[in-house]
Regions:
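Extreme N-terminal starter segment of soluble prokaryotic enzymes
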Residues: 1-4
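Compositionally biased, low-hydrophobicity segments enriched in charged and small polar residues
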Residues: 8-27, 100-116
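Short, surface-exposed ligand-recognition loops at beta-strand->loop->(often short) alpha-helix junctions
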Residues: 9-13, 91-92, 160-167
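Glycine/small-residue-rich interface belts in oligomeric ring/scaffold proteins
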Residues: 10, 15-74
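Vicinal oxygen chelate
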Residues: 34, 44-47, 53-58, 86, ...
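A basic- and aromatic-enriched beta-loop-alpha substructure that forms the phosphate/nucleotide-
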Residues: 58-97
Length: 211
């Protein structure tokens, strides 16, 4: 399993303003990630080191956002003022998770500004909606050259602080989650509080930044 990316749902300021805030905090530029037409969302991304990235996402006023769980999740987080939506784990095969959750993975599609398409499959967003400490799962279908990991970043993802219980996440993943998981620190706090990602720490050229 690979900690693939973290997702931030924008607040009232909107996508451009939130992306600029991250750019200033991390000292790097974000990129136009295009639209998720099947989910009713639009995003910008910041490439990170170690084949990871930061997704900054905004829901669109589009029927797809009302139907797709991902669009619903982004809208709900944004309506609460915005903040960390969750974390995402990449796997080679979604079949075991489809069997365990008793539903098929859904197809994802994102169009680049230059017209190219990025395709993947994902599952587990409904689990994230019900219990925001849980990551969802993704398998990339497109060639490596168009995946976000092809955009090599200099900022590193160091740590994710999660309100929740380690055992709950381990049961969801089907494997243990040590304090350092795939080279990323996974800290759990507030086991009896509202679950979800509380903060993310990055390592930049000028030091650590906790958001």
């Amino acid at each position: 399993m690979h900690v693939d990316h973290v997702v931030y749902a924008v607040g009232p300021a909107g996508l451009a303003a939130e992306a600029k805030r991250f750019e200033e905090a991390l000292g790097v530029k974000s990129r136009d990630g295009g639209i998720h037409p099947r989910f009713g969302t639009i995003m910008r991304l910041i490439p990170l080191a170690d084949d990871r990235y930061l997704e900054i996402v905004e829901v669109l006023d589009h029927p797809a956002a009302d139907k797709a769980p991902y669009g619903q999740a982004v809208r709900a987080r944004s309506e609460l003022g915005g903040g960390w939506l969750g974390w995402v784990v990449a796997v080679d095969d979604l079949t075991p998770f489809e069997a365990r959750l008793d539903r098929p993975a859904v197809a994802g599609l994102r169009h680049f500004p230059d017209g190219r398409a990025l395709e993947w499959r994902q599952i587990g967003v409904k689990g994230l909606i019900a219990d925001p400490q849980l990551p969802y799962f993704i398998t990339w279908l497109s060639e490596p050259g168009v995946r976000p990991s092809a955009l090599k970043g200099t900022v590193a993802l160091k740590n994710i602080e999660i309100a929740g219980k380690r055992q709950r996440v381990e049961d969801w993943l089907g494997e243990s989650v040590p304090p350092v998981f795939d080279s990323v620190g996974i800290d759990f706090s507030s086991p009896n509080g509202y679950p979800g990602v509380q903060s993310v720490t990055f390592v930049t050229d000028t030091g650590e930044v906790r958001i």
